[in-house]
Structures are given as C-alpha cells and as structure tokens.
From Swiss-Prot:
Effect of loss of the gene: Flies exhibit aberrant midline guidance of axons and establishment of muscle pattern.
Ranges of biased composition (kind: Low complexity): 36-46, 117-172
Protein encoded by which gene: Sdc
Keyword field: Developmental protein, Differentiation, Glycoprotein, Heparan sulfate, Membrane, Myogenesis, Neurogenesis, Proteoglycan, Signal, Transmembrane, Transmembrane helix
Residue intervals annotated with topology Cytoplasmic: 366-399
Secretion signal, residue range per the UniProt entry: 1-28
Protein name: Syndecan
Amino acid sequence: MKPKQKISVEPLLLVAILIGVLVAATHAQDQKSVKPSAAAPSAAASRPHDEIYIDDDSIEGSGGRGGIHEDLEKDPDYSGSGFGPDDEDAEPDQHSHSSHNTRISQSSNSGINTAHTPTQTSSTIPTTSTSTPMPTTTPTATTPASTTTAAATQISSFANSSSTTTTTLAPTIPAEPQQPLFPPFDKDLDTESSGDGIDADAEDDDEDDGDDKDYDYNKELDKEIDIDGPEPGHLPPVVHHNTVETGHIPTTDEIDVDGGDEDDNGDSDIDGPRIGGNDGDITERGPGAGGSNVHELDPNTNVNSQPSDTKGIDHRPNGNEVVIMSEDDRTSSFFSQPGILAAVIGGAVVGLLCAILVVMFIVYRMRKKDEGSYALDEPKRSPANNSYAKNANNREFYA
C-alpha cells in the first residue's frame, strides 16, 4: 500500500511545480510592465533639474557672477602702491567695479578717510619729500625728521581735504557724483595737524629739539606746496583709489563725518607704519608704505569672490541632486532592458525549480528511512524460538 501512496504524491508535486512556474512567470511580466512606467516619470522629473541647472550656468555666464571675476581680472594688483599707471589711465578699469567692491575698499582705506575725495585733489598735493632743505650743522639728526614732516604734511592735507568733502555727503541718502570741492588752503590747520604727527615721531627720534626744526621745515613745505604745480608723473598712492570711490557713499562705521576724528585718524596713520601699529588696526597702513596698499586689495578680491563662491555652493547641491536622479534612472533603466529582465526572470525560475527538487529529494529519503531496510514478505523470527532450538540442539547443556 505504501508504494501506491508514493506514486500518487509525485504527480501532485509536479503539478505544484508547474503552478509555481506559471505564477513566477506572470509576476515577472507584471514587474516588467510596471518598472518601465515607473522609470518614465523619473526620467521626466530628472530632465527639468538638468534644464534648470543649465539655465543657472547660462545666467551666471551672462554677467551675474562672471562679470565680477572679469572685473577682478582687469583690476591691477599694483593699485594704490604708487608704482602703477596714473589716475587717468586707471579710471576705466577702476570704474568697472560693483557697488559692494567700492564699499569694501572704502572700509579698508578708511584710516586715512580719503575714500570719497574728488579725483582732482592730487593737483594741489605734490610729493615734496625730497625737496626739503637740510641744515648743515646736524644733517644726520634732521634728515629722518624732514622726511617724516613731508609725509605728515601730505597726510594732514589729505585729512583736511577729506574732512571738508565728507560733510557734504549724507551717510544714509544715496547721492549723485558731485563736482570736486576744493577746500580753502589753511596753513594753521596743516601745521597743527602736522605738528601732532611730529610730536609722535619726535619721541622716537629727537625728542623736543627736533620739533622746532621740523615746525620750521613745515612752513617751508607749505610754501613749496603753494608754488609748485601738480606733478602728473608722481601722484600720491592714495589718490589712485579716489577714482573708484567718487560718488559712492560709505556704509561702514569706520568712516566718520566729523573733521576732528579724521585728523586723529590721519595722525594715527603717521604713527602706525613706523612704530609698528596695533594688531589688525587700520593705522598699520600709511601713505608711504606702497606694499601695504597692494595687500589692501587682497581682502577686496577675496570678499568679492565670496558671493561667487556662495553661488557656486548654492548650485552644487543642485548638481548632486542631478547625480542622484541619474542614479535612480540608471537603476530603473537597468531593469527596463529586456535582456537583463529576462535573465533575472529565468534565474528566479531555475532557483525555484532547484529548491523544489531538493525538497522532494529530502522528503523521499525521509520516507525510505521510515520504511526500514528489511524485506516485507519474509516472516519475522522471534528470539525465543531461536534460543529454544539452540538449546535443544546443544546436548552439553543437559550433561
């Protein structure tokens, strides 16, 4: 009876295998029909991101961010050092800056407060540091003092000219570029402001004796400034910045409208580059240090590059999103290809068949072990009968 039951179970297993194969095939066909439809909107959704990203690049190339970089490339590195071209040659390059570029350059040069002085102030201030007379009695002691007084008169004249012009500009209301206002030349103001700088420098050099001599030299310098005309070949290094900031209103807190504060700033500028200045203070940048003016342009270029960098950072996530969408498209297109999909379905079907065959073989071995290895037709012998027969045949047991 048991072999008949075994034969009746095998057709049922085969039918179950066929049903499983049909179910797997239909499920694979459903996946094949669903995945291309799911891949279509993902591809359609990725296209607008790509188009938007391309549009942003085109907008940036049209003058949003590229214009600033082009202006920075045109900006000479030697501006403000005194070794570059004249103001007339540098005006087209300097006027091409944006508004925030001019504000930052004003904050960097606000120690002298000549950021928004008119361009024609250079005509009244020639460089006469080399034309100062030196006495014959003490040439070694008065030579540095004479050069410092020349620089002091230059800076004081800068401070006075800037103090008169800054009062005409309102700090909050934007104004149009005004005509240059030439301040009245006052010798008393120049000597007072330059005298303060002489006192600061004389403490390091000649104490009180050098102050009187420098004061006399100061008057002679004022006379020379009245007589001499503008020297176009030798312009002050600070006036080179004036072509940028004409007509712009300062927005930083460092630039003051009061004239007294500007005179103090001018005096502190005299002390800064010679004594050593404070840490990170504006007084470190004096008019005589040409190299420091070159370094002043570095923060401007860095700050101007910051909006462009932030724009690039804003667009980088968009680029990453495009890459993520392309990965989704890649996975969807991977299963949407007919050859790859057929291979996956075939592998799944073969795996199911192998699993079913293994289960059937295990079940067959378990049933064969339960039946036993003995023959079903042979009668079983009891151990009692065998022992009795052996005892009957054994005669030595009775002896």
